[in-house]
């Protein structure tokens, strides 16, 4: 649910720290998180995931979470390409989890790949449809972008990006 207009707002905050190379890609349909993120992490289309890794795929009609196997899907992609990359995976659902990653950043630099899912924007999108208060706060697109930018400026995720910039690492935002 990370939209291009939200990226444009956040990229303004990052402009002093990073050099951007933007590449536009096509997306799979549907773009729902459970399909898109699982496809990115596995390097496969949803049907391929369900066929090749049925134990990692959760069907639409099942109650359990659809994105609970993202770290395993990353591992399957690394294994399929016969790579020996070390990686970490964190899903950041709140400020405390984000702060913990900032504190551990030195240890993570030894990995070939670090995957961080920042769930705030997804949660904001869902809250926008489910919560009357959030609908009022983000009653139009300009307000929605403003909330996104304000959150980023004031969140530990901003500090995480600053630390990544200081360490001169490549960051991919999607």
Where are these regions (language model features)?
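A long, amphipathic alpha-helix that forms part
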Residues: 133-171
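Beta-strand elements within well-structured catalytic alpha/beta cores of enzymes
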Residues: 1-7, 40, 113-118, 157-164, ...
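His/Asp/Glu-rich, glycine-adjacent segments
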Residues: 29-139
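Segments forming glycine/polar-rich beta-alpha architectures that bind adenosine-containing cofactors
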Residues: 1-30, 35
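Composition- and surface-driven signal marking solvent-exposed, interaction-prone regions
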Residues: 7-13, 129-131, 174
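Active-site-proximal structural scaffolding
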Residues: 3-7, 33, 67, 98, ...
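Alpha-helix capping and helix-loop boundary segments enriched in small/acidic/polar residues
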Residues: 24-31, 61, 65, 144-151
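Short alpha-helical segments and helix-capping/turn motifs at coil-helix boundaries
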Residues: 9, 23-26, 97-103, 156-158
């Amino acid at each position: 649910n990370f939209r291009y207009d939200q990226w444009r707002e956040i990229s303004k905050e990052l402009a002093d720290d990073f050099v951007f190379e933007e590449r536009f890609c096509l997306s799979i349909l549907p773009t729902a998180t459970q399909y898109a993120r699982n496809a990115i992490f596995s390097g496969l289309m949803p049907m391929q995931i369900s066929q090749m890794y049925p134990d990692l795929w959760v069907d639409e009609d099942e109650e359990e979470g659809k994105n609970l196997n993202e770290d395993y899907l990353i591992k399957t992609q690394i294994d399929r390409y016969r790579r020996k990359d070390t990686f970490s995976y964190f899903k950041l659902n709140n400020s405390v989890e984000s702060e913990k990653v900032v504190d551990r950043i030195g240890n993570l630099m030894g990995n070939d790949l670090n995957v961080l899912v920042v769930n705030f924007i997804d949660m904001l999108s869902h809250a926008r449809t489910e919560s009357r208060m959030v609908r009022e706060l983000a009653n139009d697109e300009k307000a929605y972008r403003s909330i996104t930018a304000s959150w980023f400026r004031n969140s530990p995720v901003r500090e995480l990006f600053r630390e990544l910039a200081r360490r001169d690492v490549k960051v991919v935002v999607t």
